[in-house]
């Protein structure tokens, strides 16, 4: 069900009036009940790779990989070090320079013949590499808001309703009180939570999480895992998650892919 702009805004502002302590169950309910904005695609095939090969010099990273991700599936991506997990995610996110030479479709169309920004509009993404490269000393809320436009920094000033959804997700991740603090003054764990909020902020159709619990303390690992599980219960959401640890996977995983390193 798609809600009106007013209904969505009323939902977002309601959290300000609630009790400051929120149980994980309440947190999950808030995420599941978040009104949809109607910016959905309706293709059954969200990602389709047809005999995709990636080589760097004389080293083959991916060799004739066929892989289809259907709408609503939740994939666990695992494999040996150097097997190409991060490379595969960069292809799906349209961040790999070799993407355009490969037979890849996203959202049911010829993905790479579309504007890269059209592709990214549907994707939320976070990874340890992104965290290491993120050196913008903007207020934390502007880092989160940059996920609305898929920029590293903010190039457009967010509208009030956009700031409301940013604050809402920062509250979900437990960092609302840090919204005005410069990103580089946050602890490493707080930075990771801000980048996670950035990945979720546009309620993406495809959520790509590369080691999302990396660098978090025990409490926040539990919190983020619950957030991921709740997000997966939203209608037609698709997820690809990389982790080295089975215990980090949410109970909502439906499919698995394991990459072997090419010798």
Model regions: which residues?
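Conserved structural motif at the start of ABC-family nucleotide-binding domains
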Residues: 47, 62-64, 179
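Conserved ABC ATPase signature
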Residues: 156-158, 182-186, 190
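Pre-NBD coupling/linker segments of ABC/ABC-like ATPases
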Residues: 2-51, 123, 154-162
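Hydrophobic anchor residue at the start of the ABC signature
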Residues: 196
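Q-loop/switch helix immediately C-terminal to the Walker
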Residues: 135-153, 165
């Amino acid at each position: 069900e798609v809600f009106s702009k007013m209904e969505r805004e009323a939902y977002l502002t309601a959290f300000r009036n609630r009790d400051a302590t929120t149980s994980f169950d309440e947190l999950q309910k808030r995420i599941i009940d978040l009104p949809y904005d109607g910016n959905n695609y309706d293709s059954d095939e969200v990602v389709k790779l047809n005999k995709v090969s990636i080589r760097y010099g004389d080293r083959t990273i991916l060799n004739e990989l066929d892989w289809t991700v259907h709408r609503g599936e939740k994939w666990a991506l695992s494999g040996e070090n150097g097997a190409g997990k991060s490379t595969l995610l960069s292809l799906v996110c349209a961040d790999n320079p070799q993407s355009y030479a490969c037979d890849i479709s996203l959202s049911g169309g010829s993905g790479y013949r579309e504007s890269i920004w059209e592709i990214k509009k549907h994707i939320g993404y976070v990874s340890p590499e992104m965290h290491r490269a993120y050196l913008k000393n903007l207020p934390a809320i502007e880092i989160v808001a940059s996920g609305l436009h898929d920029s590293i920094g903010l190039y457009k000033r967010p509208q009030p309703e956009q700031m409301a959804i940013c604050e809402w997700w920062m509250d979900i991740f437990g960092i609302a009180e840090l919204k005005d603090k410069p990103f580089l003054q946050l602890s490493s764990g707080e930075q990771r939570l801000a980048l996670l909020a950035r990945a979720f902020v546009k309620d993406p159709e495809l959520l790509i999480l590369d080691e999302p619990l990396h660098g978090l303390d025990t409490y926040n690992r539990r919190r983020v895992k619950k957030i991921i599980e709740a997000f997966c219960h939203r209608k037609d959401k698709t997820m690809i998650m990389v982790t080295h640890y089975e215990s980090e996977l949410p109970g909502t995983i439906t499919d698995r892919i394991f990459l072997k390193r090419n010798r």
